[in-house]
Regions:
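Conserved phosphoryl-transfer catalytic core
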Residues: 374-375
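Core catalytic lobe of class I
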Residues: 1-368
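Residue-level detection of the helix-turn-helix DNA-binding "recognition helix"
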Residues: 371
Length: 375
């Protein structure tokens, strides 16, 4: 939910002037305001490397005609469609921060009674073009549009490609796992329903897709000078146990009633489960630790008994956010949707507190009261 994501994202900076900007433009023919290019394409007010996250879904191949020459999705053959997708990505690369991510929702199609295989073709080409597919996520749909076919199963999944430019990208798996995985890595299959009341748009993806992508890959704040994203600092405080577990609650009580201190708990972590039984024989835990550490661990074990094991794996906890050394103000991360469609990405990002920017050739699906348009 919005509240869960807002809570885990921490202190997103407040901005007095934070509109949702939407420009009517061809997503395949755009470039940043500071690019200096003189070619025939649409110059956005966005600057180079100012976008932290792109969440988008391009037009399906040969599905909807907007009545515009050379529009994406109306190519005669699928190979040209894939080529145009790759060219569009290379346009967007100019806007994307080096540590930024793209979550690219791509559907498949039946043609001449056969699945075309568009996601597979795209995956091969995008890697050949230098992008890294960090995850190939499956959107498993809990609901969908009725299908009249009586000789095959109804398609109930789409593909989401998480694309990055290099191996140094912003990623908050800890925050994501707190919301969507109960503290553990929840995997690459996203079970999501289509949103209701999405108007006349043919293929809106759900708000939850944007929530998930933003939680994973959009920093809550970035430096106004250098653009560096702030990253979560996670530690494991020795007493940070799951107190809902009776054993953990009892362990904390025994510790607090004793003369032990946190040095003893740190010693327990250092020694770990290798200090007992067969694990001690196999791993030689006691022999690999400083004598002082081993002494503290023995003292703790004598007081806590079997409950000392509870302190072996304390839970991780956010202790702050780290950024650059510019010592200037920060602003919320920037989310961009080149195929803004019904505005799901932009409105969701805005509701979370992020800055939001989009382009589209067809603005008929937007809610004018929520957005600022320019042609």
């Amino acid at each position: 939910s919005f509240s869960e994501v807002r809570n885990i994202q921490g202190d997103i900076p407040e901005m007095e002037d934070r509109p949702i900007n939407v420009e009517r433009a061809d997503a395949c023919e755009i470039h940043p305001a500071d690019s200096g290019r003189e070619e025939d394409c649409h110059q956005l007010e966005l600057e180079s490397e100012s976008v932290n996250l792109i969440v988008t879904s391009p037009p399906y191949w040969q599905l909807r005609d907007y009545g515009i020459d050379d529009q994406l999705g109306q190519e005669d053959d699928v190979e040209k469609y894939i080529e145009n997708l790759i060219n569009a990505l290379n346009r967007w690369k100019d806007f994307l921060h080096p540590k930024g991510s793209i979550f690219f929702n791509l559907g498949d199609k039946y043609h001449n009674k056969s699945v075309v295989g568009i996601p597979g073709m795209f995956a091969q080409r995008v890697q050949e073009d230098g992008w890294t597919i960090r995850n190939h996520i499956i959107w498993a749909k809990k609901n969908g549009i009725p299908d009249p076919a009586d000789d095959r199963l109804v398609p109930r999944h789409e593909h989401i490609f998480h694309l990055v430019q290099n191996d140094d990208y912003y990623y908050d798996l800890f925050g994501y796992s707190q919301v969507y995985g109960n503290g553990s890595n929840p995997g690459d299959v996203w079970h999501m329903s289509h949103d209701r009341n999405t108007g006349d748009h043919l293929a809106p993806f759900p708000q939850e897709l944007v929530l998930r992508a933003a939680t994973l890959a959009c920093p809550p704040k970035v430096c106004t000078k250098c653009g560096e994203p702030y990253s979560r600092k996670v530690e494991r405080p020795p007493k940070n146990l799951n107190r809902d577990r009776p054993q953990a609650a009892r362990a904390i009580k025994k510790f607090e009633d004793s003369d032990l201190n946190e040095e003893h708990l740190e010693a327990i972590r250092a020694v770990g489960i290798s200090d007992a039984g067969k694990a001690k024989v196999i791993q030689g835990g006691a022999e690999n630790n400083d004598s002082k550490v081993q002494e503290l661990a023995e003292e703790a074990k004598e007081v806590l008994g079997g409950y000392f094991r509870e302190f072996t794996f304390p839970l991780p906890k956010t202790v702050g956010w780290s950024g650059c050394d510019c010592n200037v103000d920060t602003v919320p991360g920037m989310v961009f949707d080149p195929f803004a469609g019904s505005g799901t990405t932009l409105n969701t990002a805005y509701s979370l507190g992020y800055r939001a920017w989009g382009t589209d050739l067809d603005r008929s699906n937007f809610e004018p009261k929520l957005n600022h348009y320019s042609d």
